[in-house]
From Swiss-Prot:
This is Sp110 nuclear body protein. One of its GO terms (molecular function) is DNA binding. The modification Phosphoserine is found at S175, S177, S226, S277. The gene is Sp110. The lineage of its organism: Eukaryota, Metazoa, Chordata, Craniata, Vertebrata. Induction: Up-regulated after infection with M.tuberculosis. It comes from Mus musculus.
Length: 445
């Protein structure tokens, strides 16, 4: 019998602490989780009643379960896992199945070399309880007896074993040829038929004849009535039987020959179409080339040939990109030309602005009237006499508008000009600053 080691018990405890929250959320109803822990004396009657009262007081069930698991952590024993992952709990709480598998994987890491992985927690059950992990897990399959010349080859004993041995076998034998991958055996309808490579069949024909096809001993016969095992057997029938491989090898040339015949016929038809209509001949030839089957290697499914259609597509993409680049360049060059023309038209305006000296006195015009504007007086208000005409008389803004024939204008800043530009335009540019009383003529009206 297998004895529990401290390392395995410590690993199970650490995993139990790690999975407490997941277990708490997997329990979605109090019964039968609380009752199973109470009946197996893992929690006291007092804790059982307090937990039920907490659930009645609308405390979240996951929090109550987490508190119970925390108390079990202090007095942890692997037998707690047997009660937690019993058949009843796994049926009532389906979310526990994935958690149970994680605990089983922890046991696999600490299993012994000569023991199957499914009997790791064999002695964890209490005999008085009458349950063990053997009732939860399927029994391991017996090993298939092989000839002496195949004893050094890797063996597959259990389809439900971990994936690590299978990965090691694949790493040791990477080539898919029949010499590098010996066929260990085939399972069909409850019978086993061990098959070796072609070299071993030629050397040891007598040994293969002596081996029975339907032995009755437990070592060579593997039977499993479970549906999962039958599915695995049916899935493995196709790659194991050499007859199916031969049939596939025979079918491949027929399929490829029929395809090749079609390919030979299609180019002839395309050539005939090309003579009739030379405009569409190139397109039809490209379609025929794209339709032909690509040659594939038997050892890998990677495509070994690049069709001409892909090359033509690449060339078209390159030409389209070059055309787009040329169009963009022409657009950018076309955009720059009107900007230069605008700059040439704006040059005399800048010379006008540069000639103006924005001193306290500005030459202003309003229609035919001309005068000089004094900014310091204008800041006091538009009703002040701030403009001096050519005769030397001082005028207000309204009087200057009357003299220029623009008395009806309400926007005096848009009428009075200084060197071709209105005072409002100069004010917006920040070249002039006036008082906040912009329209005093309204007050006079």
């Amino acid at each position: 019998m297998f004895t529990l080691t401290k390392a395995l018990e410590k690993a199970l405890l650490q995993h139990f602490i790690y999975m407490k929250v997941n277990i708490a959320y997997a329990i979605n109803k109090p019964f039968p989780f609380f009752e199973a822990l109470r009946d197996n004396s893992f929690i006291t009657e007092r804790m059982y009643k307090e937990s039920l009262e907490a659930c009645q007081n609308l405390v979240p069930l996951s929090k109550v379960v987490h508190n119970i698991l925390t108390s079990l952590e202090q007095t942890f024993h692997p037998s707690v896992l047997l009660t937690l992952f019993s058949k009843v709990n796994l049926r009532e709480y389906p979310s526990l199945v994935a958690i149970f598998r994680s605990f089983r994987n922890v046991g696999y890491t600490y299993e012994e070399k000569n023991r199957p992985p499914l009997t790791l927690l064999e002695d964890l059950a209490n005999p008085a309880e009458g349950c063990s992990l053997q009732t939860l897990l399927p029994p391991p399959r017996p090993q298939i007896s092989l000839p002496s010349h195949l004893s050094s080859a890797p063996r597959v004993c259990d389809p439900r074993a971990t994936a690590q041995p299978i990965i090691e076998i694949l790493d040791e034998q990477p080539s898919p040829s029949p010499r590098a991958v010996p066929l260990l055996g085939c399972i069909q309808e409850g019978k086993t038929t061990p098959v070796s490579s072609r070299d071993h069949q030629r050397k040891d024909k007598e040994d293969s004849r002596e081996m029975p096809h339907s032995p009755s001993g437990p070592e060579s016969v593997v039977k499993d009535d479970s549906p999962a095992a039958n599915d695995l057997e049916m899935a493995r029938e196709v790659p194991c039987t050499p007859a199916n491989k031969k049939a596939r090898r025979k079918k491949r040339p027929n399929w490829s020959n029929s395809k090749r015949r079609r390919q030979k016929k299609k180019p002839r038809q395309d050539e005939m179409m090309g003579v009739a209509s030379p405009g569409h001949g190139v397109q039809e030839k490209l379609k025929a080339v794209s339709r032909r089957t690509l040659w594939k290697d038997d050892s890998s499914t990677n495509v070994k040939e690049v069709t001409k259609t892909q090359r033509t597509r690449m060339r078209r993409a390159q030409t389209s990109n070059s055309q787009e680049i040329s169009k963009e360049a022409s657009k950018t060059s076309g955009r720059k030309r009107p900007s230069t023309a605008r700059r040439t038209t704006q040059v005399p305006e800048k010379t006008k602005n540069d000639a103006v000296d924005f001193s306290p006195t500005l030459p202003v015009t309003c229609g035919k009237a001309k005068g000089t504007l004094f900014q310091e007086k204008l800041k006091q208000g538009a009703s002040k006499k701030c403009i001096q005409n050519e005769a030397g008389d001082w005028l207000t803004v309204k009087e200057f508008l009357n003299e220029g024939g623009r008395a009806t204008s309400k926007d005096w800043k848009g009428v009075i000009r200084c060197n071709g530009e209105t005072l409002r335009h100069l004010e917006q540019k920040g070249l002039l600053f006036f008082t906040s009383k912009s329209k005093p003529q309204k007050k006079g009206a």
